[in-house]
């Protein structure tokens, strides 16, 4: 895998040098593109950090080759898919619940409790597949709605053994000033190489069928843990959608923005992201201090970063939804965060076994199902204040 990353890094360096972008003073080409097409939308911090200047080649190479080690060190969770677990998944592998180390993905509503490998950090759930069941990665029975007083706020927490962990899904009634929710925010785990220049990203085949050839070209063993993560991401990008849903995967910042514009039917869009500490924050109870609706609905495009050596976003339309920016204050004092929140108002086409229904005690077509957008994930909304589209 290291050879693949070294070769990819070398290609990136050549491309950037050819474009005259080498050096910390010059903005990345993708950053120039963003400013040109989204002049009224500052680059979110998480996205800006992914636009790495390859001038620091040695440092970047160290980060890139560490992708293999990081993938192997991560817990056996992938919170981007709710598909069924293979028969050999073991509940005992679902570690980390007691310490609040579980995180969740909100982009797979079609799967069950499939363990897909440590594709993207300490994550259990996927947020863009609505047709599947309770992909709790072998730990389904350990998760249940809380019996604490917080349940009255419409929250549903993951519980492992006797220890409560972070909120996973919650009812829309919890998005009110004064409500309390327990959250643990994990450290950011961005792709090692960040966003590739578009010409480089477009030159690397991004399909399951092409992956063996790509790996062979760079002499990468096909049985490595990192390759398994890459395969899982490709499968997720190629998986079918539910009726009425649009989905795409973007391997460059330019493709991400252009495809979001295409799906929303207007070039006047804006990104909405959570403001969270990049280093993460420990489990604690947060109190909602203010709630601001996100205009531009009822359909948004939600984008979630995927496990790959370079940045890949998997995006999908949310279906009928309401979105909010929720300001919260942590019980420990000083820990203020703002979470971008999506509440799906029509779940009638979701799989009845979807984990959110189990945690919230509801069913398809019932009350809205809400979840936050983790660090680096993006909601794209029509900019209704500037465009009638």
Swiss-Prot record:
GO terms for biological process: pollen development; pollen maturation. It holds the Pfam family BURP. It comes from the Eukaryota. Required for pollen development. Probably synthesized in the tapetum, packaged in Ubisch bodies and transported at appropriate stages to the micropsores. Specifically expressed in anthers, in the tapetum and microspores (at protein level). Keywords: Signal. This is Protein RAFTIN 1A. GO terms for cellular component: exine; Ubisch body. Residues 1-20 form the signal peptide. Disulfide bonds: none annotated. It comes from Triticum aestivum. Residues 73-92 have a biased composition (Basic and acidic residues). Transmembrane segments: none annotated. Residues 73-105 are annotated as: Disordered. Residues 169-383 form the BURP domain.
């Amino acid at each position: 895998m290291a050879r693949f990353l070294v070769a990819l890094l070398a290609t990136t360096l050549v491309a950037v040098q050819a474009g005259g972008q080498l050096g910390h003073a010059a903005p990345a080409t993708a950053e120039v593109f963003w400013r040109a097409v989204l002049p009224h939308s500052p680059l979110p911090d998480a996205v800006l950090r992914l636009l790495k200047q390859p001038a620091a080649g040695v440092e970047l190479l160290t980060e890139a080759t560490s992708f293999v080690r990081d993938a192997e060190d991560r817990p056996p969770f992938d919170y981007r898919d709710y598909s069924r677990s293979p028969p050999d998944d073991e509940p005992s592998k679902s570690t980390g619940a007691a310490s609040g180390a579980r995180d969740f993905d909100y982009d797979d509503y079609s799967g069950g409790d499939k363990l897909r490998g440590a594709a993207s950090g300490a994550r259990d759930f996927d947020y863009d597949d609505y047709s599947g069941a309770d992909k709790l990665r072998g730990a389904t029975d350990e998760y249940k709605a809380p019996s604490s007083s917080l349940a009255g706020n419409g929250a549903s927490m993951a519980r492992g053994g006797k220890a409560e962990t972070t909120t996973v899904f919650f009812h829309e009634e919890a998005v009110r000033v004064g409500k309390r929710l327990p959250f643990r925010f994990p450290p950011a785990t961005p792709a090692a190489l960040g966003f590739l220049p578009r010409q480089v990203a477009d030159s690397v085949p991004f399909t399951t069928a092409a992956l063996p050839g790509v790996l062979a070209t760079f002499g990468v063993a096909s049985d490595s843990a990192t390759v398994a993560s890459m395969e899982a991401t490709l499968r997720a990008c190629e998986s079918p959608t539910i009726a009425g849903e649009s989905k795409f995967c973007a391997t460059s910042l330019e493709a991400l923005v252009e495809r979001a514009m295409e799906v929303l039917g207007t070039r006047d869009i804006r990104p909405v992201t959570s403001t969270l500490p990049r280093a993460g924050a420990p489990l604690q109870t947060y109190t909602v201090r203010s709630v601001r609706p996100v205009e531009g609905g009822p359909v948004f495009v939600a984008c979630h970063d995927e496990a790959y050596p370079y940045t890949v976003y998997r995006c999908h339309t949310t279906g009928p939804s309401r979105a909010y920016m929720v300001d919260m204050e942590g019980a420990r004092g000083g820990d203020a965060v703002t979470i971008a929140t999506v509440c799906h108002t029509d779940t009638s086409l979701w799989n009845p076994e979807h984990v959110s229904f189990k945690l919230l005690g509801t069913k398809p077509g019932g009350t809205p199902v809400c979840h936050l957008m983790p660090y680096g994930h993006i909601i794209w909304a029509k900019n209704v204040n500037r465009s009638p589209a």
